[in-house]
Design a protein with these regions (language model features):
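Function-determining surface determinants
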Residues: 1-497
C-alpha cells in the first residue's frame, strides 16, 4: 500500500486517573507491547521550521531509524507527512537530509515556504523520549491506530540546563477509510474517559520549552484566502478557520493557563465566527443539530460572564480610578472559576466533534458544485440593507434594537473576512476599516449597557457605586453619539462586494 501523503489524527488528553483504563482498552485491542520512541527534533538556530508550521525529526523506533517531515495545513487535525527509513544501526543519531523529502508533497510545501533552507542550517533543538502502546483497530469504513503515549520532552536551556515536560496523551489516527470513523471513536473516549481534544503537537510543546515560551500566543482571526470558488473549497476553508481558532485557543487554556484572558477572548471570537459561518452554510442546507445549537448557545453564554467582568476589571475600574472615584467593590474575573472545566466538559467536547463531522460530511456532499458564491453575495446584500434601515433611526430605537444591529454588523464583518476574495480589491480595505470603527463603537456601547445592568444591584450595598453609575451613564450618552456618527460614515461608503 502506498504511503499516505496526508495525516489525519485526533489527539486527546484525559485525567491522569483514566490512564490505566485507556491502557487496558488498548491491550484488549491487541496493544500488548510498548515501544520506546526516541526522537530528535531538528531546526535552525532561530527555529525557522517551527515558526513556519513545520516539524522535522529523526526517530529511533525499536531498532530502526525513521526520518519524518510534517507540514501544517489549514486544518488543525491534518498535516502533510513523509516518512523515510534510514539505514543506520546503533544508538547514535544518524545523518539527516532534507533532500530525501524534495519530491514528496510535504517536501514541496517546505521548499515553497523556505526555498533557501539547507540541511547544513539545521541542528538538534529538542528531543522526546516516549513509550507508546499502539493498537490497530478495524472499524466499519476505516482502519485506525490508537497510540497511547507517555514520556517526556527535553530541551536544553541557554545556560546548559535541561528542561523537561511530561507527555501523557492518546492519538487516534486514520490509516485508511472514512475520517468520520475517527470522530466516532473519539466520541466514545470522551464519554467513557472524560477525554478532551488537544491540538498541541509534541513539536510545538518542544519548541515552547526550548525557547522558554510558557504558552503559545492566542490564535487570532484574519481574512481568508480561497484558492477557488467551488462549494467544497468555500465550506471547508471557512468552517476549518472557525473551528481551528476555537480548538487551538481552547487547548492553550486547558494547559493550566493562568493568564487566559486573551485566549478566552479569541476562543469566543472563534465561536462567534462559527455562528456567522453556519448562517451562511444554511444557504447550502448545512445546519447544526438542535443539541449542538443548544450546547453552543449555553457555552457561549457562560464564556460571556468572563468577558463582561473583564470590562469591569480592565476598562471600568481604571477609568474610575483616573476620574478619582471613591473606593468600591465590583465583581471581578478573579471571582470566577478557571474556564478549563467548562471547556473540557463532555457537552462542549462533543460539540467540537460534531462541528468537525459537519465539515467532513459537507466536503463529501458538495464535490464539483458551484452554487454557493451567488447565494453569499445575495446574503451580504440583505445584511447590508437590513442594518442600514436600523442605522437610519439609530438615535430613536431601543437598546435591544441597537444590540441586534451590533450583532448583525459583527456578522457582516466576519463574513467579509471569510469572503474577501469575493470583494472588490480596491474598496475592501477602506470598507472593512469603517465597519471595524462602527463595530468598536457599538461594542463599547454594549459593554457600558451590560456594566450598568451588573452594578445596579450593588448600589444599595455600596453608596460609592453611585459614582460608577453616574460615570457610566455619561459615557453611555457620549458613545451613543459616537456610534451614530460612525454609522453615518460607514453607510455613506460604497459596498465592498
Amino acid at each position: 500500500m502506498a504511503e499516505k501523503t496526508q495525516e489525519f489524527e485526533l489527539k486527546l488528553l484525559f485525567p491522569q486517573e483514566k490512564f490505566k483504563g485507556i491502557e487496558q482498552f488498548l491491550i484488549s485491542k491487541g496493544g500488548l507491547r510498548r515501544q520506546r520512541l526516541q526522537a530528535a527534533y531538528i531546526d535552525t538556530d532561530d527555529f525557522l521550521l517551527a515558526r513556519s508550521g513545520i516539524a522535522f525529526r529523526v526517530r529511533k523506533e525499536g531498532r530502526f531509524w525513521v526520518q519524518t517531515l510534517k507540514v501544517a495545513t489549514g486544518h488543525s487535525l491534518e498535516r502533510l507527512e513523509h516518512n523515510v527509513p534510514l539505514i543506520h544501526s546503533g544508538a547514535n543519531l544518524p545523518q539527516w537530509s532534507l533532500e530525501s523529502h524534495r519530491d514528496h508533497e510535504a517536501g514541496k510545501a517546505l521548499y515553497r515556504l523556505l526555498p533557501k533552507l539547507k540541511t547544513t542550517d539545521l541542528r538538534v533543538r529538542y528531543k522526546t523520549d516516549i513509550y507508546r502502546r499502539a493498537a490497530q483497530v478495524k472499524a466499519r469504513g476505516a482502519v485506525l491506530e490508537y497510540a497511547l503515549d507517555s514520556g517526556v520532552i527535553k530541551a536544553l536551556h541557554n545556560d546548559g540546563s535541561e528542561l523537561t515536560v511530561d507527555v501523557s496523551e492518546l492519538e487516534i489516527e486514520l490509516l485508511s477509510g472514512d475520517k468520520s470513523v475517527v470522530l466516532a471513536h473519539a466520541k466514545n473516549m470522551i464519554k467513557k474517559y472524560k477525554a478532551y481534544i488537544d491540538t498541541r503537537s509534541k513539536a510545538q510543546r518542544g519548541f515552547n520549552l526550548a525557547t522558554g515560551i510558557q504558552v503559545s500566543p492566542p490564535l487570532k482571526t484574519k481574512a481568508l484566502k480561497l484558492s477557488t470558488f467551488d462549494d467544497v473549497t468555500i465550506i471547508s476553508t471557512v468552517l476549518h478557520s472557525c473551528i481551528n481558532q476555537a480548538l487551538i485557543n481552547a487547548s492553550e487554556i486547558n494547559a493550566n493557563l493562568a493568564n487566559f484572558d486573551e485566549h478566552l477572548h479569541q476562543l469566543r471570537v472563534g465561536l462567534r465566527r462559527l455562528k456567522t459561518a453556519m448562517k451562511f452554510m444554511a444557504l447550502r442546507h448545512i445546519f447544526f443539530a438542535e443539541v449542538d445549537l443548544n450546547t453552543l448557545d449555553n457555552f457561549f453564554a457562560k464564556l460571556g460572564a468572563y468577558r463582561d467582568l473583564n470590562f469591569l476589571d480592565e476598562k471600568l475600574l481604571p477609568a474610575l480610578l483616573a476620574a478619582k472615584a471613591p473606593p468600591m467593590k465590583l465583581a471581578s474575573v478573579a471571582d470566577l472559576p478557571h474556564p478549563d472545566a467548562l471547556i473540557k466538559s463532555q457537552d462542549v467536547q462533543l460539540f467540537f466533534i460534531s462541528v468537525l463531522g459537519i465539515i467532513i460530511e459537507a466536503e463529501k456532499n458538495n464535490v464539483n458544485l458551484k452554487y454557493f458564491k451567488p447565494l453569499i453575495l445575495k446574503e451580504l446584500d440583505k445584511i447590508h440593507k437590513d442594518t442600514k434601515k436600523t442605522a437610519n433611526t439609530f438615535m430613536m430605537v431601543s437598546d435591544d434594537e441597537r444590540h441586534r444591529l451590533r450583532k448583525k454588523l459583527k456578522r457582516l464583518r466576519y463574513a467579509l473576512e471569510f469572503f474577501k476574495d469575493l470583494c472588490h480589491a480596491g474598496r475592501y480595505k477602506e470598507f472593512l476599516k469603517k465597519l471595524e470603527g462602527v463595530s468598536d463603537a457599538l461594542g463599547q456601547y454594549n459593554d457600558i449597557c451590560v456594566a450598568l445592568e451588573k452594578i445596579q444591584s450593588l448600589v444599595e450595598q455600596d453608596r460609592n457605586v453611585f459614582f460608577a453609575q453616574g460615570w457610566l451613564k455619561a459615557e453611555q450618552a457620549r458613545v451613543l453619539v459616537l456610534s451614530n456618527k460612525e454609522l453615518k460614515t460607514f453607510y455613506a461608503d460604497k459596498k465592498a462586494w
